[in-house]
Amino acid sequence: MSAPRAEEQPSRSGERQPLVARGPRGPRRWRRTAAAAVLLVQMLERAAFFGVTSNLVLYLNSLNFNWDGQQASRATLLFLGASYLLAPVGGWLADVYLGRFLTISLSLLLYLAASGLLLTTITNDGRRSFCGEMPELPLEPACPSSSCQGSWSSPYCATTLYLVLLLLALAASSVRSTLTSFGADQVMDLGRDATRRFFNWFYWSINLGAILSLLVVAFIEQNISFLWGYSIIVGLVGLAFFIFLFATPVFITKPPTGSQVSSMLKLAFQNCCPCRRSSSRDSESAHLLPDQRSNQPGPSPQEDMANFQVLVKILPVMVTLVPYWMVYFQMQSTYVLQGLHLHIPNIFRTNPNISLLLRSDSSNYRIPEAWLLLANVAVILILIPVKDHLIDPLLLRCKLLPSSLQKMALGMFFGFTSIIVAGVLEKERLQYIAANQTVPQLIGKDLYYAAPLSIWWQIPQYLLIGVSEIFASIPGLEFAYSEAPRSMQGAIMGIFFCLSGVGSLLGSGLVALLSFPGGWMYCPKDFGNINNCQMDRYFFLLAGIEAVTAVLFLWIAGRYERTRQDPASQRSSSRVRG
């Protein structure tokens, strides 16, 4: 039986409590219901997101568009980068103008519209409406000379597709930056332990959506039809939007409190220019009497300064995580390249009783290398419930539960071990290549010369990067939310995700830098492969970068913990977080 309705309960700062009556067990029950709705929305949104990214290169490279592989890869990287770098936009809109509930609702609506536009590009009529007729493929002139340069032309339907992908990235980034803090708002009144558990299960739902997308949506797109696959994506986003609106009565919604980003920038400028510091401080004190400061809307100058001091302490912690993100995103780039040059077994064993045609087809049907991401996802799906129900309660009873910063340091260690394992495996692989011990294997229409090492040797590095997520990314989310000033929680969550995107771009930039002549990734004699590269040194370089920043992180984290234990700092932080 559903709970009877009650009048809307206003609270401080215009906060709206759930439209449900509260019995003796009401608060905890409805808070869990609200959190469960947020987790379900997150799972559906992530399933839709991975459904787009997993086969986007294949879709753009299909006969519908005939994009080159380089053009399709560039579009995918742009989409992934934008989906992280645009995260502060959604957080800022939520803090200043719309509030988190309305920002999420509008973002899901934009998500639905953009995915619908992507769906229309599959049909011939839809492509003609948005892009016109596809031009005939021109015959390239003979170009025997190395100095001959072909003419560059924009790929078919590029403007429409880039616009659709940009809208999808904006919607996904806004949902990512605001849904996290909105879900934490639902359980904040239940204590810090409830917030910690929420972030554990929030990350669990992300990976559950990923595994469902990789197993179902990506398979349908590749083996049945993109029309069916993208229709499922639209349905997932529509269902997420419906569930979010349906759960409105049980949500705690908070009005926009205003973002202090501009105030923070002004204070940063004043602190960098001592000549302006005293004059601005004198002008503020001269124009504001004590009784006027209490009636002034928004944060007072003193609160602005306290927020700025908290922000100055938080940002170094988040910035030192950037090298970890450089390592983390290798599992979607260089780890995949490495796997393509290891021996990949067939899905079906060749049966001597079947026809020659079927035998040929089955022998080329290999396990998708991207499915090794399932090892990363599986370890998260298994370990998060174990950690939440067994390990953390035991450590809490023994008063040995580590802080968020200590967990993040442990996560950086596991990321370091993952990239070291990848480097050792690559070094071993290159020894087989140097001895000319290669195995030709056909993956799709591309021929690769792989080392006779099974691809299953990559599983340890995927498992280790999965464990690192549990200890680095989840506590990082918890740290960003719980330590941020209340009026900047959305923006800080956006900055957290933005910095992860910066790590991805820095990793790509390092690959590009090492691809110049003389670099470790420069392979002019082996176009499309990495057998003449020295990617093991690239892995070890990343490990060295993360090791150095891990030491810096430990120093910054220790200093942060000592400052946080200071009584004056505790009083200031409690006032800031409200």
UniProtKB/Swiss-Prot annotation:
Protein name as it appears in the record: Solute carrier family 15 member 3
Region described as Disordered: 1-27, 280-301
Lineage top rank: taxon: Eukaryota
Compartments (UniProt record): Lysosome membrane; Endosome membrane
Keyword Transmembrane carried by entry: yes
UniProt feature, compositional bias: Basic and acidic residues: 1-15
Free-text function comment from the UniProt entry: Proton-coupled amino-acid transporter that transports free histidine and certain di- and tripeptides, and is involved in innate immune response. Also able to transport carnosine. Involved in the detection of microbial pathogens by toll-like receptors (TLRs) and NOD-like receptors (NLRs), probably by mediating transport of bacterial peptidoglycans across the endolysosomal membrane: catalyzes the transport of certain bacterial peptidoglycans, such as muramyl dipeptide (MDP), the NOD2 ligand.
Signal peptide: none
Residues bearing glycans: N223, N353, N436
Membrane-crossing segments per the record: 33-53, 77-97, 102-122, 155-175, 201-221, 232-252, 308-328, 367-387, 405-425, 462-481, 494-514, 538-558
Topology in membrane: Multi-pass membrane protein
Keywords: Endosome, Glycoprotein, Immunity, Innate immunity, Lysosome, Membrane, Peptide transport, Protein transport, Symport, Transmembrane, Transmembrane helix, Transport
Family: Belongs to the major facilitator superfamily. Proton-dependent oligopeptide transporter (POT/PTR) (TC 2.A.17) family.
GO molecular function, one term: peptidoglycan transmembrane transporter activity
Reactions catalysed, as given in the entry: N-acetyl-D-muramoyl-L-alanyl-D-isoglutamine(out) + n H(+)(out) = N-acetyl-D-muramoyl-L-alanyl-D-isoglutamine(in) + n H(+)(in); glycylglycylglycine(out) + n H(+)(out) = glycylglycylglycine(in) + n H(+)(in); carnosine(out) + n H(+)(out) = carnosine(in) + n H(+)(in); L-histidine(out) + n H(+)(out) = L-histidine(in) + n H(+)(in)
Biological process annotations from GO: dipeptide import across plasma membrane; innate immune response; peptidoglycan transport; positive regulation of nucleotide-binding oligomerization domain containing 2 signaling pathway; protein transport
InterPro entries: MFS_trans_sf, POT_fam, PTR2_symporter_CS
Expression sites (tissue/organ): Expressed highly in bone marrow derived macrophages, and weakly in spleen and lung. Expressed in plasmacytoid dendritic cells (pDCs) in response to toll-like receptors (TLR) stimulation.
